[in-house]
């Protein structure tokens, strides 16, 4: 009888340990730095993901859209910021430039992840925004030089 109770407790502990070791879903954060720029200035769009070693994460690729007013300047490689046990903290940065004035609603950052046979989309909780302002050119306070 004692042997059966001991075996049951051992199996219960093994099941609890296996459940605790099961991979947690990845988490995602994103930010825009700076969030307010002048026309033609560059800004950094950063996505960070904390994931398990067995999970695969695909970061978005930005295509050319001349009507968007935002242009991709450089897509930097994925950085591994830290590794704690089975968890990896990854960062993907994009350098972008804005060529239209206004407030841009960039929406929620997204990344695809695969865990075993499951493919899903990760989305941030907050929506990102970028404010692009123009600079004033005051031609009345300066005399225009005419070489004629």
Kindly give the residue locations of the regions a language model identified:
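Bacterial N-terminal signal peptides
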Residues: 8-18
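Surface-exposed interaction/ligand-binding surfaces
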Residues: 23-148
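Bacterial N-terminal signal peptides that target proteins for export
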Residues: 1-9
């Amino acid at each position: 009888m004692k042997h059966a109770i001991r075996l049951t407790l051992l199996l219960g502990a093994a099941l609890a340990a296996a459940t605790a070791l099961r991979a947690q879903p990845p988490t995602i954060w994103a930010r825009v730095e700076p969030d307010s720029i002048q026309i033609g200035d560059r800004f950094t769009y950063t996505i960070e993901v904390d994931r398990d070693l067995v999970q695969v994460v695909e970061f978005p690729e930005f295509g050319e859209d001349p009507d968007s007013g935002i242009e991709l300047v450089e897509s930097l490689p994925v950085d591994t910021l830290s590794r704690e046990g089975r968890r990896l903290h990854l960062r993907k940065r994009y350098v972008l430039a804005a060529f239209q004035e206004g407030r841009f609603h960039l929406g929620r950052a997204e990344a695809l992840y695969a865990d075993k046979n499951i493919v899903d989309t990760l989305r941030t909780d907050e929506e990102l925004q970028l404010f692009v302002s123009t600079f004033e050119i005051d031609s009345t306070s300066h005399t225009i030089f005419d070489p004629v």
